[in-house]
Amino acid sequence: LPLCCYLRLVSAEGDPIPEELYEMLSDHSIRSFDDLQRLLHRDSVDEDGAELDLNMTRAHSGVESESSSRGRRSLGSLAAAEPAVIAECKTRTEVFQISRNLIDRTNANFLVWPPCVEVQRCSGCCNNRNVQCRASQVQMRPVQVRKIEIVRKKPVFKKATVTLEDHLACKCETVVTPRPVTRSPGTSREHRAKTPQTRVTVRTVRIRRPPKGKHRKFKHTHDKK
C-alpha cells in the first residue's frame, strides 16, 4: 500500500493528517520504515511497549488459556514478519496481451501466437500524492508473431509484426490536473448575444413540365376573296 494512500486511510479513520506531513514526505527519499521514523523524529520503542501491554491486558480479561495462546501466536507472527519496503519507481516486467486488432482489424477468423508477451513498464509509488511514476525514456521494439488463419477448416500460418513499447527509465513527475472552466449563466448569455446568428432559408421550387401531347398539323388555307 503506498505511503500516501495509507496516510489518507488513517486520516479518514481518525484524526486528520496535517498537510505539513505531506510536504515533508515530498522533499525526502523514504525507502523504509526506518527512514520514515528518522524523518519524523519519533521513537517506536514506547509504541511497541504500549502495544505489548495492551495485548497482555486483553489476555487477562478473557479466558486465560485461550487468550494467552492467541497472544503468543500474535507475538510470534510479529517477530517473524519482515519490515515492509516501498515499491520504488522503476521498470518492471509486465505481461502484454496481443489482441487481434493490432494485426488485422478487417478479419476476425484467425488466431495470434503467442497471445501475450513480456514488456518493461514503469511502476511503483512516489512519496508525494501530487507526483506519479512515469516513463522518462521509451524504446519501440518490433516482434514477430504468427497469424493462424482457418481456411477451409485447415490452418494457414502467416507472419506478422507487432511493435511493442518498452520503458527504459522512470521518474516521479508532477501530475498536472486541468482546472474545470466554470461559466456563469450571464456570461453564456452575453456570449450568445455577441455571436452573430445567421439563418439560411432554403426554398424548394418545383418545375412543372408541359404536358406531353401529339404535335398538331395545321393545314394552310388560302384566304378567299
UniProtKB/Swiss-Prot annotation:
One of its GO terms (cellular component) is cell surface. It is found in: Secreted. It comes from Rattus norvegicus. Residues 13-73, 183-225 form a propeptide. PROSITE patterns: PDGF_1, PDGF_2. The record marks 100, 103 as: Involved in receptor binding. CDD domains: PDGF. Glycans are attached at residue 55. This is Platelet-derived growth factor subunit B. Disulfide bonds join 89-133, 122-170, 126-172. SMART domains: PDGF. One of its GO terms (molecular function) is signaling receptor binding. Expressed in a distinct subpopulation of smooth muscle cells in injured arteries. Antiparallel homodimer; disulfide-linked. Antiparallel heterodimer with PDGFA; disulfide-linked. The PDGFB homodimer interacts with PDGFRA and PDGFRB homodimers, and with heterodimers formed by PDGFRA and PDGFRB. The heterodimer composed of PDGFA and PDGFB interacts with PDGFRB homodimers, and with heterodimers formed by PDGFRA and PDGFRB. Interacts with XLKD1. Interacts with LRP1. Interacts with SORL1 (via the N-terminal ectodomain). Interacts with CD82; this interaction inhibits PDGFB-mediated signaling pathway. GO terms for biological process: actin cytoskeleton organization; angiogenesis; blood vessel development; blood vessel morphogenesis; branching involved in salivary gland morphogenesis; cell chemotaxis; cell migration; cell projection assembly. Belongs to the PDGF/VEGF growth factor family. Residues 1-12 form the signal peptide. It comes from the Eukaryota. Growth factor that plays an essential role in the regulation of embryonic development, cell proliferation, cell migration, survival and chemotaxis. Potent mitogen for cells of mesenchymal origin. Required for normal proliferation and recruitment of pericytes and vascular smooth muscle cells in the central nervous system, skin, lung, heart and placenta. Required for normal blood vessel development, and for normal development of kidney glomeruli. Plays an important role in wound healing. Signaling is modulated by the formation of heterodimers with PDGFA. Keywords: Cleavage on pair of basic residues, Developmental protein, Disulfide bond, Glycoprotein, Growth factor, Mitogen, Proto-oncogene, Secreted, Signal.
